[in-house]
Design a protein with these regions (language model features):
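Donor nucleotide-activated moiety binding/catalytic core segment of transferases
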Residues: 1-41
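Catalytic binding pocket for nucleotide-activated donors in carbohydrate/polymer assembly enzymes
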Residues: 3-4, 38-111
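Alpha-helical elements of Rossmann-like donor-binding domains used by nucleotide-donor carbohydrate transfer enzymes
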Residues: 28, 85-88, 121, 125
Length: 130
């Protein structure tokens, strides 16, 4: 078993115990490993690599079900079923390899409305000129 000393594994309780929230750190990351959490959809706005842990995909499908008909279509990143998949994902990140940029853009277009000029649109709405 490899020891990945430069990777920090955090759970919500680790953050909560220290009065912190995940979203305070997300912009500092180079990539995100997630399960089926909606944080992955939010992370699309950063356009950085995503990896999805799917080792319990079948069990999750049977026990909870999905919002989308084809949930894997909405997971635009490395699908990791075992430690080797995880290690490959980390190596790709280390080597600057991004295999899912186009897929992320496609899912981002489906899940996020207009993603530019937010401030200008607010100013326009309130008839504020700068």
């Amino acid at each position: 078993e490899n020891v990945l000393t430069n990777i920090v594994y955090l759970e919500n309780r680790d953050l909560a115990d220290n009065g912190l929230q995940l979203y305070e750190f997300i912009n500092c990351s180079d990539a995100l490993v997630s399960d089926y959490s909606s944080v992955a959809i939010d992370y699309l706005l950063l356009d950085r690599p995503l990896g999805f842990t799917l080792d319990d995909y079948e069990a999750y499908t049977e026990s909870r079900g999905w919002v989308f008909d084809d949930p894997l279509e909405y997971m635009p990143g490395e699908h990791m079923y075992n430690m080797q998949d995880f290690e490959n994902f980390i190596l790709d990140i280390k080597n600057g390899k991004d295999n899912y940029k186009e897929q992320r853009a496609s899912v981002r277009a489906k899940t996020h409305n207009v993603c530019d000029n937010y401030c200008q649109r607010v100013l326009d709405y309130f008839n504020i000129t700068m």
